[in-house]
Structure formats: structure tokens, C-alpha cells
């Protein structure tokens, strides 16, 4: 989860910097504490912070910067899927790759929720077609990817 989260946030940071914006990670300590507490009950989800962007930014740039995070998770999921297929069971690499696939697929789909603070909200406001494509890809990976296990 941590690697998927980190690379997701770095995707936002590098996309923002490409547009000449200042981007830095800010931690949300309360969310980290909540994530740790929830892990004791079997629910593992961590959003201990986010990349904050400042600079001249319009709706299109914000949408593209927001799309970079889920796009990174989709690419990671596809890479892990390829690794899972390249390693026949029983194999620890197949197991790790399968979990990497599942985690990154869910991270992409979860972040595409069209609600305030989520990437999906900013992408939806910018371009509904782009939103639909990214959600569609993440949906297919999450619900069509059972064969990776």
C-alpha cells in the first residue's frame, strides 16, 4: 500500500512541477493515527497526507495533475499483473505481484470517487470523458482482475 500511495503522490508532484507549479507533500497526522487504529480491525487504508499544489493553475491543469495519481496506480497495477502472469504458482513473486495488482487497482478506483478532495472530483470537473476512461480502466482492473490471484 505504501509504495502505491507514495508513487501516486509523486505522480501528482511531477505533473504539477511540469506545469511550473510548486508541489509539496503535507502529512495529515490524524489520518495516519486513524489508519493505524483501523488496521487493528483488519481494515488497511492509509491516506496520511497529500501533495499540495500552488501556483497559477486552471481547471484543465488541475484535472491533468489530479489524473496523474490514478494513472500511476493503473500503470503499476498493469506491471504487477504482468509479473503475476510471468511467475507460475506456487511462487512468492506471483503472490507479491498479485497483491501489488490488487492494491494499485483499488487505489486507482478509490481515488476516482467524484467527491471533494478526491482526484475524481477534480477530473470530473475538468473533463467527464477523461474521468470516464480512467474510472472504466480502474473498474475493469478491480472487478475483472480476479485471474491475477
Sequence positions of predicted segments:
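Hydrophobic transmembrane alpha-helices and their immediate loop junctions
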Residues: 1-149
